[in-house]
Structures are given as structure tokens and as C-alpha cells.
């Protein structure tokens, strides 16, 4: 795709939506807000999604949609949180919401079901795994020298990565892990970024669309 950013801050017009998109909206038994409609449509079309909306406005639905509309081990989803406590909370939540899917969690001291379709982890876990994997590919490390937290065919099996609280990108302590993770992910992976407090979200969107010259998302 040609890289292009679309700012979706107006009322969503269902008159322009396809029947397939309207069918996706009807998955829920309530009317979606405009930003939720824009996000669900963009997810379906394979675009990166950045949602900046107040706490309690329904950002969680966007993450749920990304998980709900992924299927099987060739469309695995990784959900990233900045802190372990939130990872534990989301793991419990996803197990209840998606009983039909396998859900796993990896934190500093817990590794449960790492082969799952939906993996919850802290950002540092994915960053460290991608970094070691990159060093093996470059020949800086032998495969036997690394201790990966999980095994996955990132290029072929990973469909989406959800960055919860993506405003941590601006945090002096944790921001590096978020940025490095985004940089190391293949362009084929769809990014879903959620935040209530991010400053100037359009700047982040512009950075994301330009971060991977070999990517095929917009």
C-alpha cells in the first residue's frame, strides 16, 4: 500500500460503509461510537490504528475487535502493556472474553501457554525477544546462545501487536522499549495503538507510517 495517514476526527458516515463493514459493526449489540467505527473498519482493511480517546470512552473495544477478528496460529496477536499488573489483568480479562481462543501470558516471572493465539506480555519482553532474534539473524549471536521468552515465526504467524498505553513512548524510562519494539517489528504486522493521554497523536501516526521503509501497511 501507499503510505498515507487519515485523521478520523469527524462523525463516521455509515452511508459510505460497505455491507461487510456494517456487518462487522453489528457484531456488537450496541451502537459503536464514531471512533470505534473508524477503528474497526481500519482493522478490517489491514491498516495501522492509533486511538487517542479519554478513559472510559471505549478504547478497549478496539483491542477486542483486533483479537476477535483474528483466526488461528497464522494470525496470532500480541497484547503489550507497560506494567506487569496490567498484563495480569488483561490475561484474566481475555480468557473470560474469548473462551474460544487460547490465551497466554509472559512476564518477568511467569510464562504460561507461550504458543497461544493471543499472547499478553510487557513491552520489554517483546523488545528483548526481537532484539535477540535480530542478533541471531545478523550472525552476532548463535541460536544456542540466546534464551528467547517465546518462539514464533514473526514474519508469517504474527498478525497484530496491540500497544496499550502507547503514550509510554514519551516516558524517559520505558519509552525506549516501545520505540525499539515498533522499529524491529516487520512491516507486515498490523499495529494497534491505544492511549488516553498522548500528546499530538498525529505526530506519532506520521512517525509510525514512516518507520518501516519495507512495510506494507498504511
Please identify what each model-predicted range represents.
Residues 29-218:
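Conserved P-loop/Walker A NTP-binding site and adjacent catalytic elements of P-loop NTPases
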Residues 1-36:
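Pre-P-loop entry segment of helicase/translocase ATPase cores
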Amino acid at each position: 500500500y501507499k503510505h498515507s495517514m487519515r485523521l478520523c476526527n469527524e462523525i463516521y458516515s455509515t452511508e459510505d460503509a460497505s455491507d461487510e463493514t456494517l456487518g462487522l459493526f453489528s457484531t456488537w449489540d450496541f451502537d459503536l461510537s464514531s471512533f470505534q467505527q473508524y477503528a474497526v473498519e481500519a482493522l478490517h482493511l489491514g491498516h495501522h490504528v492509533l486511538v487517542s480517546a479519554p478513559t472510559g470512552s471505549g478504547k478497549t473495544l478496539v483491542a477486542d475487535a483486533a483479537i476477535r477478528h483474528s483466526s488461528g496460529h497464522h494470525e496470532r496477536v500480541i497484547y503489550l502493556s507497560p506494567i506487569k499488573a496490567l498484563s495480569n489483568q488483561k490475561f484474566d480479562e481475555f480468557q473470560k472474553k474469548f473462551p474460544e481462543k487460547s490465551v497466554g501470558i509472559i512476564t518477568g516471572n511467569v510464562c504460561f501457554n507461550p504458543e497461544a493465539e493471543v499472547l499478553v506480555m510487557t513491552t520489554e519482553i517483546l523488545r528483548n525477544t526481537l532484539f535477540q532474534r535480530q542478533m541471531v539473524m545478523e550472525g552476532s549471536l548463535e541460536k544456542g546462545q540466546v534464551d528467547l521468552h517465546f518462539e514464533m515465526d514473526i514474519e508469517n504467524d504474527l498478525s497484530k501487536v496491540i500497544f496499550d498505553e502507547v503514550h509510554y513512548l514519551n516516558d524517559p524510562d520505558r519509552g525506549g522499549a516501545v520505540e525499539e519494539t515498533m522499529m524491529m517489528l516487520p512491516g507486515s504486522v498490523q499495529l494497534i495503538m491505544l492511549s488516553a493521554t498522548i500528546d499530538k497523536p498525529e505526530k506519532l501516526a506520521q512517525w509510525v507510517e514512516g518507520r518501516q521503509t519495507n512495510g506494507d501497511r498504511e
